[in-house]
Amino acid sequence: MKLPCAALGLFAIGCGVDAPAPCDRTVPGNVCTIAGNGENGYSGEEGLALEARLSLPMDTKVAPDGSLMIIDWNNHRIRQLAADGTIHFIIGNGEIGGSIDDPATGDFNHPTGILFNPAGTQLYISAWHNSKVRAYDLATAAVVDTCGDGRRAYFGDDSPALTASLDLPASIAWSPTGELTILDQANQVIRQIDTAGKIHRLAGQCVVDMAAPSGPGACPDGVAPTACPAPSGKTVCGDPAIWCSTACSPGYGGDEGPALAMRMGQAFGQAADPGGRILYDPQGNLIFADTTNDVIRSIDPAGIVHRIAGVAPVNGVAQGGYSGDGGAALSAQLNHPVDLALGDDGTIYVSDVYNHCIRAIHPDRTISTVAGVCGMKGSSGDGGPATKALLNRPYGVEWNAGTLYIADTGNSVVRAIRLK
């Protein structure tokens, strides 16, 4: 059955999409739709997940009980795919919510990341457009704010996390020592909440140095940016009275140097789409998608930054595209990488969003495609090899127990591949 075209914001959705058909998920390498009927919208609670409507699913997370949590992004909800194939509402009122001064409630404005606490009793949520991180208690259904005052700004480093300001927190991860790490997307930094509840800048810089008319331009050679008034962590190349209220500028720099001195590139502003995700590997390296720079980078336990995939920007221009499968990941081109997942063997899976495919950075640092046909957008391939299927802006990817889960965002479905 073909479904009608529709458009919403940054995404073209539901355009001539084939409704998903049942397929055998046990066949290694085959791709199967497991949630969503391919039609953008909201429906299906307590029914079969394959008959439900989703709206731009952004990511997934396997719960301690084995069910799959789904970020139903444009429905502002978290939903649960149960083992029997049914779908259930977990949290989110389905409307944009959570004003600055409201108490913590079940309102979410485009959540982008979910994470269980180590005990498996709470679900932490990156409430992206709320500019907060919230926690949902699975036993009591209580919601509490854990970071962010709801103001889209950059304030509060080295202060209590609840009084700090974030700007589009895109992703969260637990450090090996129990700190909550946040990719603060529009602030172009990675921040961390220590076990005492204070927030600190871990990597990146919030510098205002965009070219006119949006910014003052780069600082002259040898001139350091000027700090904005405390408690802001922002610096500017120009008059602080004019530019301290301006958004932080994307940039690129700092490879093989200290993380606090590096620059990254993430989308910002009201029209931004969700950007870089983060994860830790067992060795304690923090891996992140430097999305608008079209590279994947890591920060080692000593705090040094390394580029691990993608061609670095040249003279400030990102080198996005598609190339390099079968060769070195550092020589390959990516196009708007967003999400990351870590396989049991150390393979890093990357949602190469604008290439409409999922790439794999192998332990020997070569790269390949594991799902989708890079450079081709569509919706097809259920029941066949994942590398021949067509995806549409897949923003989310997760690995769990030999299965790769894909949030096939533009098709408003979740798909799965049994790889091992």
Segments from the language model and where they lie:
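Gly/Pro-rich loop segments of beta-rich domains
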Residues: 25-56, 86-110, 140-170, 198-274, ...
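Residue-level detector of Asp-centered blade-edge/turn motifs that repeat once per structural unit
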Residues: 62-65, 116-120, 174-177, 280-283, ...
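Bacterial Sec-dependent N-terminal signal peptides
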Residues: 12-30
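Short loop/turn segments that connect beta-strands within beta-propeller blades
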Residues: 81-86, 137-141, 193-198, 299-304, ...
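Generic structural signal for coil-to-beta-strand starts
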Residues: 67, 86, 121-122, 179, ...
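Conserved beta-strand positions in repeat-built beta-propeller and related beta-rich domains
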Residues: 70-73, 125-128, 182-185, 280-281, ...
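Structural signal for beta-propeller blades
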Residues: 76-78, 131-133, 188-190, 294-296, ...
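Blade-level signature of beta-propeller repeat domains, shared across WD40, Kelch, NHL, RCC1
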Residues: 393-420
